[in-house]
């Protein structure tokens, strides 16, 4: 456990020594700070100089990582050891993008051979859709792709297809359905033509309630309009491992793309779950996405901790969570194409590390994953940045931006990028009472009024942030960015001694929903309901009589 590691008390003592130091003072005294706390990898760079740390902090954090045998645990993951201990599974999403020829054997299965076999089928299928060779039941080309999934079967593909829209096929329109409320699927069905639409049903077990409900609604809609169930074979494909259920649905087994238990949902966009990505972007760009992630994998596996991006980001996060007692972390992308990135990272981070039980089954006496949230940075400035600047919470921030200007939008990117740098500087430097007072007096305010108002215009600063810069929003850079955050999450899970690869927290609510659904549908359940739940069930039933 973290609190039992030999470096932990050293970090506690060090925290007491520097907790009141203002970052602005460090910058004033150290002209090399920005260049020393800057790491470049391929087309992605990290400026972590605006953090409340110094060389001693980093030295101790690296010692903490050594206390946890981080290097050995990284290797264990890549080699296919069953580090998902509660489910007795290997964790090999890295194998999905590996360009290495060294085979990984897992329970007598050749992992890379299996992965590449599925990728080959995905490439052939996506080529047939993109080229127009795969036709619908009236011999029309496919114009719309509807991905039906939820969680990891939705968020990754949605995020990547949105981020890389400039690389998408101009004929294809992408639609993503996850919510079971009925509104989302019906809204999509209103926009599309059954004769030119391909549905991708993404569910490992092909029994996920939300996904199957939406898929059956789409199936009913399609059959009513096409007039024959046999046409399903041309318009529905599945990403699943349940061949029998897929065939019962009406999907040809040749249109089923498999993935494996060693790939968790939130790590699965690199697998057949990414079929919608490959169809939209094409195999060349999908390969570039995989390559970007692979290069980050190799960096994570081989780079010394001092220049290792995932290790640095993971350890800096631990520094704030377990020593500064930060409860929250903000993801602020400054690019409209990255608008779904924060909610993708929400699942990746909080479903992985939102745990309080150690690998040994003990209750953990310290904080683990913070609340991860975010929005488009430029919009957020006009919404919740007020709290970040002048509120009472310490919330570290990841600013994410690209250097590449958008064509045909002169001046836009300069405005955007200036705001990234200005916000990071403002969070670091702040504004003192004396500075605020001087500004007000310079504007001609009455002295007494200026003294009162100046208190409200103080920015305390010393608010930490990372700046992640991509040269451009490209397939390889998005691949590297996602892999960076995957490995950051892994690092923190190792430090906290938790299993980052199960998600038992999603199960209880699903179990309790079963008898409640029976009641809502008019069937009696023998389950116990608390008085509040019972009252609300009756309220619903009475309204819908």
Curated annotation (Swiss-Prot):
GO biological process: gluconeogenesis; glucose 6-phosphate metabolic process; glycolytic process
Biochemical pathway: Carbohydrate biosynthesis; gluconeogenesis; Carbohydrate degradation; glycolysis; D-glyceraldehyde 3-phosphate and glycerone phosphate from D-glucose: step 2/4
Keyword Magnesium: no
Pfam families xref list: PGI (PF00342)
Enzyme class: isomerase
Top-level lineage group: Bacteria
Cited InterPro entries: G6P_Isomerase (IPR001672), G6P_Isomerase_C (IPR023096), Phosphoglucose_isomerase_CS (IPR018189), SIS_dom_sf (IPR046348), SIS_PGI_1 (IPR035476), SIS_PGI_2 (IPR035482)
GO MF entries: carbohydrate derivative binding; glucose-6-phosphate isomerase activity; monosaccharide binding
Catalytic activity: alpha-D-glucose 6-phosphate = beta-D-fructose 6-phosphate
Gene3D superfamilies: 1.10.1390.10, Glucose-6-phosphate isomerase like protein, domain 1
Catalytic residues, chain numbering: 351 (proton donor), 382, 510
The enzyme's E.C. designation: 5.3.1.9
Keywords: Cytoplasm, Gluconeogenesis, Glycolysis, Isomerase
Similarity comment: family membership: Belongs to the GPI family.
Function: Catalyzes the reversible isomerization of glucose-6-phosphate to fructose-6-phosphate.
Name of the protein in question: Glucose-6-phosphate isomerase
Species assigned in the record: Helicobacter pylori (strain G27)
